[in-house]
């Protein structure tokens, strides 16, 4: 029987980190739109007041953004390939191995484009629930729709792209209550689908504008993405899927 790939084996190598987290990626339209969407969801659901840990923080783009908004957010990652040194980032670190005193403080865990890298995500999530005894919420974002599967997913070590049914089932298996679940990046679904169908592959390099002009230009599609996600029905397909779930603690 095939042995499942361990979680530690999913850490990014240098090539993956360079393509997914190039310097300046935080100013690209994709991260601008996702950061805004995430922050709005955290505030809307009252998760912006308590300690937050991003598991699989990569280069720390999300942590830096949320801290600028005044949130108490830190990050950890199994890899140290992409992130700059920061007192708020714990690199080459498994979340389950962080200091117990800190783990007891954390109320919310962010897993943003993380669990698709895990061959068996349910045991992975259950272990986090055990390691963080006062955990109340998971905020999870994943790549969506199997018809968008491409060379990008293969290169970055994805095991799957999700739909709502699949993600709901995993949340059910960990005993969590779904509070929010919806697709986002709806504006990117059709271009992504056409790219896969017509070209058979997509660009692996995440956009990272360098000049002030290109940074300003990236704000335009970011705003268009945010507007389309706001105005279109939640059931409409997007290239990503987000859920917020409450952890049901066992009594006794």
Locate predicted features.
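Conserved S-adenosyl-L-methionine
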Residues: 176-186
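Residues lining the SAM
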Residues: 112-115, 141
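Short, glycine-/aromatic-enriched active-site segment of Class I SAM-dependent methyltransferases
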Residues: 22-23, 138-160, 164-170
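Conserved N-terminal segment of class I S-adenosyl-L-methionine
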Residues: 1-112, 122-125, 210-218, 222, ...
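Di-metal (Zn2+ and/or Mg2+/Mn2+) metal-binding site signature of metallo-dependent hydrolases
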Residues: 117, 121
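C-terminal helical/coil "lid" or tail adjacent to the Rossmann-like core of SAM-dependent
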Residues: 189-222
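A short glycine-rich, Lys/Arg-flanked "PGG" loop and its adjoining helix->strand segment in the class I
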Residues: 122-137
């Amino acid at each position: 029987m095939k042995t499942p790939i361990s979680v530690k084996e999913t850490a990014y190598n240098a090539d993956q980190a360079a393509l997914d987290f190039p310097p300046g990626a935080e100013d690209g339209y994709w991260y601008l739109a996702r950061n805004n969407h995430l922050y709005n969801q955290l505030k809307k659901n009252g998760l912006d007041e308590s300690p937050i840990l991003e598991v699989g923080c990569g280069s720390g783009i999300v942590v830096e953004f949320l801290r600028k908004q005044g949130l108490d957010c830190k990050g950890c990652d199994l890899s140290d390939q992409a992130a700059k040194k920061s007192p708020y980032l714990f690199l080459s670190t498994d979340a389950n191995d962080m200091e117990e005193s800190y783990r007891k403080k954390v109320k919310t865990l962010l897993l943003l484009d993380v669990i698709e890298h895990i061959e068996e995500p349910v045991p992975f999530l259950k272990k986090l629930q055990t390691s963080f005894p006062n955990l109340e919420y998971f905020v999870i974002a994943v790549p969506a729709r199997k018809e968008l599967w491409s060379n990008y997913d293969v290169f970055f070590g994805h095991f799957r792209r999700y739909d709502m049914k699949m993600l709901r089932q995993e949340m059910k298996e960990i005993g969590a209550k779904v509070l929010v679940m919806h697709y986002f990046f709806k504006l990117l679904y059709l271009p992504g689908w056409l790219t896969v169908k017509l070209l058979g592959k997509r660009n692996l390099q995440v956009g990272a504008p360098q000049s002030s002009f290109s940074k300003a230009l990236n704000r335009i599609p970011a705003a268009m993405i945010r507007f389309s996600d706001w105005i279109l029905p939640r059931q409409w397909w997007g290239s990503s899927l987000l859920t917020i779930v409450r952890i049901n603690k066992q009594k006794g």
